[in-house]
């Protein structure tokens, strides 16, 4: 629905098209479907309960397939409880290697070593700094630390054309270090980028770190992920648990394992409500089934 949205909407309502691929625009009230039979939700963890229920309400008997590398606690709990069917794709693409993951306290020496090693083998680097207010200062620091690096900045508050140019420069290797926010979490596939450094990884969620880590290692080259943190005393206990789990789960296809740990850390959410994480207090699965 990104191109010619009005024409696409009319075609869907009239049944003139068999497949409609869209963003959240499909949730608009003006979108109607003549005979909706199958709904596929990609990156399911990025949708809220209300959004998913809105999609289901488009037709009472629609078949729904949700896809995600890391199911949110509520969805995983429903699958493990037998309320939803679950299938796991555990076989990685050919020649893919697991991403070596390191959790370290941030030092200039570590940052310089990680970036320099990637650049020396002709690769590219993502440097995640999820604070727009200070991202330009961070980019300048990296440029001063590694003068040979060609550094660009990308974040969601940039003008669309400016951001497109940045991503084009990085994709075509006119730049080799992208200092960015979590805007790269999905939809980015650059095989030559095989090192990602996440500053203040303790502030990121478990599924989010896994998604971000998946931006590298998309070819046959060994990829590296550095999760930079402050002193452990500054971090919350849940943050420490998340980082321990993510550093241990390096194997390809580890998303399901991470999701089960996320379920343990955050809780299962509400079966009848809108919370997608959190510990149930008023009702459990057994009582729900009896109801």
Language-model-detected regions and their locations in the chain:
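Conserved nucleic-acid-binding Ia/Ib motif block in the N-terminal RecA-like helicase ATPase lobe
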Residues: 1-20, 24-25, 102, 143, ...
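Post-DEXD/H (motif II) to motif III coupling segment of the RecA-like Helicase ATP-binding lobe
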Residues: 33-38, 44-124
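C-terminal helicase module of SF1/SF2 nucleic-acid helicases/translocases
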Residues: 108-126, 130, 134-137, 141, ...
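Structural recognition of the conserved hydrophobic beta-strand(s) that form the central parallel beta-sheet
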Residues: 19-22, 40, 63-69, 78-79, ...
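Conserved Walker B
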Residues: 17, 24-26, 43-45, 183-184, ...
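Conserved motor-coupling elements within RecA-like helicase/translocase cores
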Residues: 1-20, 30-36, 160-177
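Amphipathic alpha-helical segments that mediate coupling or scaffolding at interfaces
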Residues: 11, 24, 55-58, 79, ...
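Conserved ATPase-coupling elements of RecA-like P-loop NTPase cores
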Residues: 5, 28-34, 44-59, 163, ...
């Amino acid at each position: 629905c990104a191109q010619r949205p009005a024409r696409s909407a009319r075609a869907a309502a009239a049944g003139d098209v068999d497949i409609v691929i869209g963003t959240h625009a499909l949730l608009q009230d003006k979108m109607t479907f003549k005979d909706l039979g199958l709904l596929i939700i990609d990156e399911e963890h990025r949708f809220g309960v209300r959004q998913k229920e809105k999609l289901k309400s488009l037709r009472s008997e629609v078949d729904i397939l949700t896809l995600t590398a890391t199911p949110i606690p509520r969805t995983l709990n429903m699958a493990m409880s037998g309320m939803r069917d679950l299938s796991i794709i555990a076989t990685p693409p050919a020649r893919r290697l697991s991403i070596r993951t390191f959790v370290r306290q941030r030092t200039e020496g570590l940052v310089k070593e990680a970036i320099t090693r990637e650049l020396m083998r002709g690769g590219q680097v993502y440097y995640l700094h999820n604070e727009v207010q200070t991202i330009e200062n961070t980019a300048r620091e990296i440029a001063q630390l590694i003068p040979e690096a060609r550094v660009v900045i990308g974040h969601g508050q940039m003008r669309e054309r400016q951001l497109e140019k940045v991503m084009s420069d990085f994709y075509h290797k006119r730049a080799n270090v992208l200092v960015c926010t979590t805007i790269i979490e999905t939809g980015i596939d650059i095989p030559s980028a095989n090192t990602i450094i996440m500053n203040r990884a303790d502030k990121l969620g478990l599924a989010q770190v896994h998604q971000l880590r998946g931006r590298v290692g998309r070819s046959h080259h060994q990829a590296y992920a550095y999760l930079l943190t402050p002193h452990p005393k500054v971090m919350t206990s849940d943050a420490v648990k998340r980082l321990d789990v993510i550093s241990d789960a390096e194997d390809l296809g580890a998303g399901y394992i991470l999701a089960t740990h996320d379920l343990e850390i955050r809780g299962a959410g509400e079966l009848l409500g809108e919370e997608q994480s959190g510990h149930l207090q008023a009702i459990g699965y057994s009582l729900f089934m009896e109801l």
